[in-house]
């Protein structure tokens, strides 16, 4: 049975899908999976699923010369021809916000069985998009899974994956089966901390001077440890500014480490005794690897992509209400002393590189109003 899996998403989104992919690999055979991901994710996908066939989705996010849509269509034509020439027993799309090109590439796959989650972009009520999606559903008889409003124990993205895999396998899939996991594939350095404070989404940023205060407070706990400041290659300039602030504040054991690829990033993250980050891909990497992790969570898109955890090693720190506030202020709602205290508690209660206590996924009791 050959199955086409379409995941045209970002790095963190791919990590959130790894649990679903592993469940499908166990049930259907990893060698029968054909996984299509963006160019930057191809090495990571190959390392995590070495027996699957990995196809590159060569789309760009920014226009250089051509109109972006035209550029992406031209570059994706070879992929479209490959998908049309290959017979699949089923096609599964794990993206819940499909644009027109992604919709086309999904349905160009040669199969009679399509599985997808409801396209959330339909909620903006644009007539053309609605007509395209409805027409595709009718023509290809797609099995559509409604996007979950929210689960009691999983972010809605992971819950959507669980529901979709359940439909494909025609059996109930437990929440524990679908939790994201990453595996190391090379040498894993140990004895270090990681601080990943940068993201492209400004509303999720925790100010670097406040990070400095946190790491100053954690100096007694970081004695003998290297603190690796990490991120994407284009984050170097901001990380250099951060490093200068740390050194000026007396934190001398920090250094910038930018792994050459995502596979090396996984190995670096896997050996960390503590990961300090915000709601970005680093949080999902660290959690999927079950490392002691403190996420300073802006609460943006809360319930959709996070919080989630594999065990009691992961803590997502939410902003707290201040006096007279109707909603939490980010990042004022997570002051450095509170974050440092949470990190110390995490270090104290978790043995380094030891066994963790798996999280028991049970439904929460309804809150009393």
Show which residues each predicted segment covers.
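Catalytic machinery of carbohydrate-active enzymes
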Residues: 1-369
């Amino acid at each position: 049975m050959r199955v086409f899996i379409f995941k045209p998403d970002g790095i963190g989104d791919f990590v959130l899908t790894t649990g679903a992919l592993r469940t499908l690999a166990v049930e259907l055979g990893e060698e029968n999976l054909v996984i299509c991901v963006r160019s930057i994710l191809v090495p990571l996908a190959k390392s995590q699923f070495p027996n699957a066939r990995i196809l590159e989705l060569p789309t760009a996010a920014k226009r250089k010369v051509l109109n972006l849509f035209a550029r992406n269509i031209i570059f994706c034509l070879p992929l479209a021809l490959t998908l049309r020439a290959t017979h699949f027993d089923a096609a599964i799309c794990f993206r819940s916000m499909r644009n027109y090109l992604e919709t086309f590439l999904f349905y160009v796959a040669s199969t009679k069985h399509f599985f997808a989650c409801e396209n959330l972009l339909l909620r903006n009520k644009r007539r053309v998009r609605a007509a395209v999606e409805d027409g595709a559903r009718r023509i290809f008889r797609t099995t559509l899974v409604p996007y979950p409003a929210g689960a009691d124990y999983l972010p809605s993205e992971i819950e959507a994956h669980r529901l979709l895999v359940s439909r494909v396998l025609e059996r109930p899939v437990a929440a524990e089966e679908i939790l994201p996991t990453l595996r190391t594939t090379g040498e894993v350095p140990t004895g270090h901390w990681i601080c990943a404070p940068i993201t492209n989404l400004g509303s999720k940023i925790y100010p670097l001077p406040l990070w400095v205060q946190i790491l100053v407070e954690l100096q007694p706990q970081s004695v003998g440890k290297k603190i690796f400041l990490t991120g994407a290659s284009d984050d170097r300039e901001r990380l250099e500014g951060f490093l200068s602030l740390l050194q000026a504040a007396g934190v001398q054991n920090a250094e910038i480490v930018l792994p050459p690829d995502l596979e090396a990033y996984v190995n670096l993250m896997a050996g960390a005794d503590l990961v300090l980050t915000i709601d970005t891909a680093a949080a999902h990497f660290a959690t999927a690897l079950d490392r002691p992790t403190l996420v300073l969570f802006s609460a943006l898109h809360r319930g959709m992509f996070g919080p989630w955890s594999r065990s009691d090693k992961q803590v997502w720190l939410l902003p707290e209400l201040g006096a007279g506030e109707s909603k939490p202020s980010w990042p004022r709602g997570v002051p450095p002393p509170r974050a440092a205290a949470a990190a110390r508690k995490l270090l104290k209660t978790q043995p380094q590189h030891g066994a963790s206590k798996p999280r028991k996924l049970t439904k929460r009791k309804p809150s009393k109003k």
